[in-house]
């Protein structure tokens, strides 16, 4: 995909601690979240159309996927509104990888949620 943004980061030592705005919190993927993830991606637009089956085929069923690396920002009412994934360099290497499939639903955009969920993904690689 030639139109994707690619950046390199030499170290994650200076990644800020995650400080979500009031009313939001962070959680990891749990088994069965494929529909939740697809809903966020579909509502955000521009990343394609996903079904639960496509999520399994392209994300959660892949060797580079690890459940601890798929993060969601939720409202305090447990509504998932943003996501990003720590996509491993290889199936067991946390030292390298990429921030994958970042999305925020339109109603919650403009609150820096993508910044904080990306920071959380970088913490996954660091920790």
Model-assigned labels for residue ranges:
Residues 25-37:
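A short beta-loop-alpha structural element at the N-terminal edge
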Residues 10-14, 75-78, 107:
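Short loop segments at secondary-structure junctions
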Residues 5-6, 34, 38, 75, ...:
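Catalytic cores of nucleotide-enabled group-transfer and carboxylate-activating enzymes in metabolic
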Residues 9, 28-31, 75, 86-88:
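Active-site donor-binding loop signature of nucleotide-sugar glycosyltransferases
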Residues 101-104, 110-127:
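Conserved acetyl-CoA-binding loop-helix of GNAT-fold acetyltransferases
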Residues 1-22, 30:
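Acyl-donor-binding surface of acyltransferase catalytic domains
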Residues 21-24, 99:
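Short, solvent-exposed beta-strand edge segments and adjacent coil->beta transition regions
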Residues 42-104:
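A conserved beta-strand-loop-helix scaffold within acyl/acetyltransferase catalytic domains
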